[in-house]
Structures are given as structure tokens and as C-alpha cells.
Amino acid sequence: MENKLSFEEAISQLEHLVSKLEQGDVPLEEAISYFKEGMELSKLCDEKLKNVQEQMAVILGEDGVLEPFTALGDEA
């Protein structure tokens, strides 16, 4: 998977693959290929999101102290 894709481009490609698979008229071999590509795109998006979360944690930290990112719903 090309890592030079932007997050938005990767999401768009992932949505396109999901749409093809949801139609249900895709030959099995092609469906497997789409699924593998979709998993790679999903991993790429996850990596990009984690990178942004790390950057935001640094940016939003008080007095230069790194504060961990807490997603909504993760608070205990």
C-alpha cells in the first residue's frame, strides 16, 4: 500500500472497496483481493490517526509536558 496517500484519499478508496463488496456480485477471488487491499488501507488510516494523536498530545501538553491522549469514552 502506498504510504503517500493522504488519510482522506485512503478513506475514499476504502469506501469504494466496501461499496463494491456490498454489491455482492464480485467473484470470490476479486472479493479476497478487495478485502486484502481494504485491510491495508485500514491499517494505513489507523497509523495516520495514531500519528496525529501523538502530535496533538505534544501540541496540547501544558508547559511542554507530554499528556497522554484520551479518546472520548476511554475515560474511567
From Swiss-Prot:
Record's subcellular location: Cytoplasm
The protein, known as: Exodeoxyribonuclease 7 small subunit
Gene assigned in the entry: xseB
PANTHER family xrefs: EXODEOXYRIBONUCLEASE 7 SMALL SUBUNIT
Major localization class: cytoplasm
Top EC class for this record: hydrolase
Protein role: Bidirectionally degrades single-stranded DNA into large acid-insoluble oligonucleotides, which are then degraded further into small acid-soluble oligonucleotides.
GO biological process: DNA catabolic process
Cysteine pairings via disulfide bonds: none
EC numbers: 3.1.11.6
Example of a GO cellular component annotation carried by this entry: cytosol
GO molecular-function term, one example from the UniProt record: exodeoxyribonuclease VII activity
